[in-house]
Curated annotation (Swiss-Prot):
GO terms for biological process: erythrocyte differentiation; translation. This is Large ribosomal subunit protein eL27. It comes from the Eukaryota. One of its GO terms (cellular component) is cytoplasmic side of rough endoplasmic reticulum membrane. One of its GO terms (molecular function) is structural constituent of ribosome. PROSITE patterns: RIBOSOMAL_L27E. It comes from Danio rerio. It is found in: Cytoplasm, Cytosol; Cytoplasm; Rough endoplasmic reticulum. InterPro entries: KOW (IPR005824), Ribosomal_eL27 (IPR001141), Ribosomal_eL27_CS (IPR018262), Ribosomal_eL27_KOW (IPR041991), Ribosomal_eL27_sf (IPR038655), Translation_prot_SH3-like_sf (IPR008991).
Length: 136
């Protein structure tokens, strides 16, 4: 079977506090490491989705409703469901990497980077499906 968990692939989180959320793989580790001896992936995802906007709303209200809350986390492959979709959101690999989990300040910075890039992409109107809440 081919390797399909690749950077840029959209995945659904199946377990934990982010269950049901969409995320994108930043880095995949198929063979595991010494501290995590199982296949896992570093993902950046959406914790709070942007709310619906209509044409009658003002600029201020639209700006407020277009906010996104992001998360950055390492997941076991068993807790991720890959989708057929891919997004090419260019997250800065120097900011979003596995070392951010050692220091809370770095983790905040990584989350901020993901949030900014997600909001940027959302405002362009591309990858609409990625920014919609999964109805279940």
């Amino acid at each position: 079977m081919g390797k399909f968990m690749k950077p840029g692939k959209v995945v659904m989180v199946l377990a934990g506090r982010y269950a049901g959320r969409k995320a994108v793989i930043v880095k995949n580790i198929d063979d595991g490491t010494a501290d995590r001896p199982y296949s896992h992936a570093l993902v950046a995802g959406i914790d709070r989705y942007p709310r619906k906007v209509t044409a009658t709303m003002g600029k201020k209200k639209i700006a407020k409703r277009s906010k996104i809350k992001a998360f950055v986390k390492v997941f076991n492959y068993n807790h991720l469901m890959p989708t057929r979709y891919s997004v090419d959101i260019p997250l800065d690999k120097t900011v979003v990497n596995k070392d951010v989990f050692r220091d809370p300040a770095l983790k905040r910075k990584a989350r901020r980077e993901a949030k900014v890039k997600f909001e940027e992409r959302y405002k362009t109107g591309k990858n609409k499906w990625f920014f919609q809440k999964l109805r279940f």
